[in-house]
From Swiss-Prot:
Single Gene Ontology MF annotation: translation elongation factor activity
Chief place where the protein resides: cytoplasm
The protein's name: Elongation factor Ts
SUPFAM superfamilies, sorted: Elongation factor Ts (EF-Ts), dimerisation domain (SSF54713), UBA-like (SSF46934)
Organism for this UniProt entry: Legionella pneumophila (strain Paris)
Transmembrane stretches, start-end: none
PANTHER family: ELONGATION FACTOR TS, ELONGATION FACTOR TS, MITOCHONDRIAL
Region feature Involved in Mg(2+) ion dislocation from EF-Tu, mapped onto this chain: 82-85
Gene Ontology CC terms: cytoplasm
Function: Associates with the EF-Tu.GDP complex and induces the exchange of GDP to GTP. It remains bound to the aminoacyl-tRNA.EF-Tu.GTP complex up to the GTP hydrolysis stage on the ribosome.
Length: 292
């Protein structure tokens, strides 16, 4: 077996980002053939990624990339198992590279995105597997949203946990960004009143009806109470009916009217929403170890 020099180990480390001992192990296994070592490391990375694929990844970041003409943008949620890894430079660099690839190629879905090439030459999926092997956690590309409009797209990132894109007609990028910030804070369900799902209204009506009947008031009064609460609910969940976060004295709809602008659509992502996290019970874990 040939002697593995420190310089060769460093060369492999610079090319792969793997640890020193990991690089030395693969160089020994391939008799110092650095190209073969990289191949074997990728194979091992895929095996590690496959083993970690079932582990829940509910932390992570939201990333957004937008074209220079501000008319096309993409937003991604990329998950890790822990918040610690979500802040890791290797993870954030990967996420931003994937967002750039998504903006360049505009894939239809995550599966399509996984097959796209990064600027480094590897595919998104290959890079994901290598990152899993390097950091030891499951990494998941959870969801992707593409947006295009003839007006302007504004976006807002609250840290890296909440992301919003807003398509605006006849308005400035600054206004679109302000609306995106409002959406991040106020979490509207739809743009306008007429878009509120009938099912959501009916569910609220049932709740309000049950509450109003307990008041003991005449049915005529109860009906007016219910109608008033329904109208309030619709305003609360529709963007145009919400008080504007920067000036609660006016509603978003009024602001847009004054600016002669129109929100075409918006998308809001929040890290981990809808993912069921496993709750660790450390007492049970310790007791289980004591019993063994």
């Amino acid at each position: 077996m040939s002697t593995i020099s420190a310089a060769l180990v460093m060369q492999l480390r610079e090319r792969t980002g793997a640890g020193m001992m990991e690089c030395k192990k693969f160089l020994i296994a391939t008799n110092g053939d650095i190209e073969q070592a990289i191949i074997e490391m990728r194979k091992a990375g895929q095996a590690k990624a496959d083993k970690k694929a079932d582990r829940v990844a509910a932390e992570g970041i939201i990333v957004i990339a937008r074209s220079s003409d501000e008319r096309t943008a993409v937003m991604l949620e990329i998950n890790s198992e822990t918040d610690f890894v979500a802040r890791d430079e290797n993870f954030t660099n990967f996420a931003n590279a994937v967002a750039d690839a998504a903006l360049t190629n505009l894939p239809k879905n995550i599966e399509d995105l996984s097959n796209q090439a990064l600027s480094s030459g590897t595919t998104v999926e290959q890079a994901r597997q290598e990152l899993v092997a390097k950091i030891g956690e499951n990494i998941k590309l959870r969801r992707l949203e593409r947006m295009h409009c003839d007006g302007v797209i504004g976006y807002y990132l609250h840290g890296s946990r909440i992301g919003v894109m807003v398509a605006l007609k006849n308005g400035s990028e600054a206004l679109a960004k302000d609306i995106a910030m409002h959406v991040a804070a106020s979490k509207p369900m739809v743009v306008s009143r007429d878009q509120v799902p009938a099912e959501a209204i009916e569910n609220e009506r049932e709740i309000f009806t049950a509450q109003a009947k307990e008041s003991g008031k005449p049915q005529e009064i109860i009906d007016k109470m219910i109608d008033g609460r329904i109208n309030k609910f619709i305003d609360e969940v529709s963007l145009l009916g919400q008080p504007y976060v920067k000036d609660p004295n006016i509603k978003v709809g009024q602001l847009l009217k004054e600016k002669n602008a129109e929100v075409i659509s918006f998308v809001r992502y929040e890290v981990g929403e809808g993912i069921e996290k496993k709750e660790d019970n450390f007492v049970e874990e310790v007791m289980a170890q004591v019993r063994t």
